[in-house]
Amino acid sequence: MSNKHFRLNKTTKTLGSLFPALLLLTPAVAFASTIDQSTSIPQNFSTDAEYVINKDVTITSSGNEAAVSVNGIDVSNVENMGNISGYGNGLDISTGAQRLVVNNEEGATISSTSATGVNIDTMQGDLINKGNITAAENGVFVSKNSSAVSISNTATGLIKGKSGLNAEVGVAIHNAGTIKGTEVDGITLSDGNIKLTNTGTVEGLQHGINVTNTAKVDIINSGSIGGGNTAISFASNKNNTLVLNTGSSLNGDVISTGSTGNSLTLVGAGIEDSNFVGLNKGDGFASVKMEGESWTLTGDLDVIGSGDSLQVNSGDLTLAGTVSNSGNTLVTKDASLQLGNGQKTASLSGGLKNNGTVIFNQGNNSTFATDMTGSGKVEKVDSHTLTLIGKNSYTGDTVLHGGTTLVANG
């Protein structure tokens, strides 16, 4: 079943058996084990530096023992081109401080019919999935005993379980494929400092990404994230960040609770109809920053920070929902903020310092009570009536492109 490949040639090994002292002058050691036959006996990878499971080879376990267990301090690389399948865990990893790289190649599978696909107990290193990891419980589970673990799910990769990926410790996650939670979350993160970039698809029955307990998570999304309850739930007590880039698509709202320091940043360009709101009164995002080229948010927005908590620092930002801002809105020079998208009517609370351009394109007659200051101009492009009742002291021009009336009572 297993062919071990050595750096020593056959003659050297034979002489070594006759003259053991010869091996003292020969530094080469066992290098790799190749699994080239299928087996229903659970396998333990612990003595060689590298293990390779050939294509079309299947390793199964019908009991609670993992189909393949990787442990000890000698293993540095495991490559699966075949099939690992267990009733218990498919692949168990417990390598402590030893750096380990696990590659699940395209077309390969790691699965469990009752437990977890890849169970990482203790490990530092990389899990690279180009194939399928599927399980009854967690597709991938990372225990709090691990550290410095990086998980890459490539464009051909699938990680699926009741919870797709569940991490109890800080990890780096790079997803270009699909991570799916069939009964709970696509990704569950409960502790540690996590960096997550998504260019693929993350979906869960409850939450796309669920951030809980003491996890601190930084997310950059230019892919798809969705859930039956929320796309993303920030429910930890740490300050989390969400960056939406070109290509981002959210199916469900983004909820913030438990922390007053969560933030949202927009880069690139996009259109989003999700709400970015707090779960309870007083919850929300400490800051929202537009750093991109063109973004439209048609959902509601809860901003709970102070100072310039809503900033339009570049490009064109359109808001078409109810924007509750405890602080101030700042529009910088050469940037623009549009309220309303021609069909929907936006509202904005808090102060508004406009050094660029503020555009009203409301879907109905509207009253705007926010005080406007700054050196920028105000434009109205819709055909409805706009009534300004704030204490306005902006010094820029007021330009009517459409509509019949502009009433200023402030």
What are these regions (language model features)?
Residues 32-258, 263-410:
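Beta-strand-rich extracellular passenger or scaffold domains
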Residues 1-32:
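Gram-negative bacterial Sec-dependent N-terminal signal peptides
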